[in-house]
């Protein structure tokens, strides 16, 4: 079957002389250390872990009792190294939890909730807890 193409278009010169013989390099920083802002919209959260704590992927690490807030969970398993102010998008300093990956894949996800047996309050609490 003949492939469909468009007539015309823009065909700028490639100009890849500088890079055509270079190998591809990973320029992104290692994910062995992550910095997770404790507030990601809504009311500010407070850390519920401390420096030196071991955390699992999916574990809640910050929360707030305020109406408009969502808890924050760890994206990696590892050890909490720092809890400090760090710049985020817009060069605004926010409280962050710094976690060093320990190489394990420990998880701490919630067990599924049975919709046939849970109450409305249990379901709402679970949704809020999940962030």
Locations of the language-model features?
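Well-ordered secondary-structure scaffolds
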Residues: 1-131
């Amino acid at each position: 079957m003949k492939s469909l193409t468009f007539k015309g278009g823009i065909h700028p010169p490639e100009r890849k002389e500088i890079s055509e013989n270079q190998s591809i390099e990973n320029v992104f920083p290692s994910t062995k250390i992550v910095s997770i802002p404790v507030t990601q919209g809504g009311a500010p959260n407070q850390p519920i872990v401390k420096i030196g704590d071991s955390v699992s992927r999916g574990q809640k690490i910050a929360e707030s009792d305020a109406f408009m807030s969502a808890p924050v969970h760890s994206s990696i398993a590892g050890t909490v190294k720092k809890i400090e102010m760090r710049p985020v998008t817009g060069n605004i300093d926010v409280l962050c939890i710094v976690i060093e990956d320990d190489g394990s894949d420990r998880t701490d996800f919630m067990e599924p909730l049975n919709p046939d047996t849970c109450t409305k309050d249990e379901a709402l609490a679970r949704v809020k807890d999940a962030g």
